[in-house]
Each structure stands twice: as structure tokens, then as C-alpha cells.
Regions:
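Non-heme Fe(II)/2-oxoglutarate
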Residues: 1-85
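A structural detector for beta-sheet-dominated domains
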Residues: 6, 88-89, 133
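Short, conserved beta-strand element in jelly-roll/cupin
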Residues: 87-89, 106-126, 172
Length: 176
């Protein structure tokens, strides 16, 4: 499967792969608090400081589960791949933003054709939300994925029931 944007105007795409992972493959990882830049911008937008803006992640600085290599086989036209498992806990809000990939660009020496692929590891649950380029998404199935170009605004939240995290795999890569 290749990641393709139908035209130069397309900013994102959606697709599906059949899940080949189990809950144990990602739920038992040693997730840590994800700290990322951007808080001042969100405070300036009027979001109060008590909001939880970040969930938990398990990234490339840790040993990756064995099944992760299959994603590079499935998405055959990407390179410089990094993986981050993300656990968005209940009452986490990630306001609309653009990822600048500063560290990724530095590490891989690239500036263009950077994409994000978000693989939904579980079926959608009420209160889970994703927005890409001003379009909202709910009701996804495990294996659904969303890919977008690096300059595309996106947002996410988990305002669902307590103890009902949203698990995703974030793939950052260069489109070949």
C-alpha cells in the first residue's frame, strides 16, 4: 500500500489496514507523560492552564514491539520512519495545531515531504475525537488510518468516560 494524496490540493487521506496487533502489544508498554511545545499558544487562545493537553507516549527512544516493522512493509513509499504509541487519557484536549517536526528534520536532514500517519489501534469510543484540516472524525475502526501533510492543522481530544483512553500509533515519515 502506498500513501498517496489524490491531487496536490489534497491535504490528508484516510484508509484501512487489517489489524495484526493485539491489545497486549500496546497497552502494556511503559507510557510516559508526553511533553511538547505549544502551551503558550494554547493559553493565548484562551485555554485555561488546568486543562490536560498531553497524554502519555512510548516513543523510539524505547525498544519497539516486534510487530512494528510490519508497518514499514505496509506503507511501502515512506522512509526515515519514527514510531510513537500514544495513550490519550480521559479529559485530554489537544487544540488545533500544526506539527513543525523540528527534531525530526534535524535528525533526518529533511525539510520537505514529511507526513504523519495516525493508526487507530482500537475501535472508536464515545468522546474520542480527531480533526484534520477542519474536518471531524469519529466512529473509526481498529486499523483505520489517517495521513496528512506536515503543514496541515489537526486536533484531538478524549472527553469520554473515565478510564477509557484512546490508543493510537503515530508514524512520522518522509514520503518517497
Amino acid at each position: 500500500m502506498t500513501i498517496t494524496f489524490e491531487s496536490t490540493k489534497d491535504e490528508y487521506m484516510c484508509g484501512h489496514i487489517d489489524p495484526f496487533w493485539t491489545d497486549e502489544d500496546y497497552k502494556n508498554l511503559s507510557y510516559e507523560k508526553a511533553i511538547k511545545p505549544g502551551l503558550d499558544e494554547w493559553f493565548d487562545m484562551g485555554y485555561p492552564e488546568y486543562i490536560n493537553f498531553y497524554g502519555l507516549d512510548y516513543n523510539n527512544s524505547n525498544p519497539m514491539p516486534d510487530f512494528i516493522s510490519k508497518f514499514s512493509e505496509i506503507f511501502s513509499n515512506i522512509s526515515n520512519v519514527t514510531y510513537t504509541f500514544y495513550k490519550m487519557t480521559t479529559v485530554t484536549i489537544m487544540p488545533r495545531h500544526i506539527d513543525y517536526f523540528t527534531n525530526y528534520k534535524k535528525i533526518h536532514g529533511v525539510n520537505d515531504n514529511i507526513i504523519r500517519i495516525l493508526v487507530m489501534l482500537e475501535d472508536w469510543k464515545p468522546g474520542h475525537y480527531l480533526e484534520i484540516d477542519d474536518k471531524g472524525f469519529v466512529n473509526w475502526k481498529a486499523g483505520d488510518f489517517f495521513a496528512w501533510k506536515s503543514h496541515v492543522p489537526h486536533a484531538a481530544s478524549n472527553i469520554g468516560e473515565e478510564n477509557n483512553p484512546r490508543y493510537t500509533l503515530q508514524i512520522t515519515a518522509t514520503l518517497s
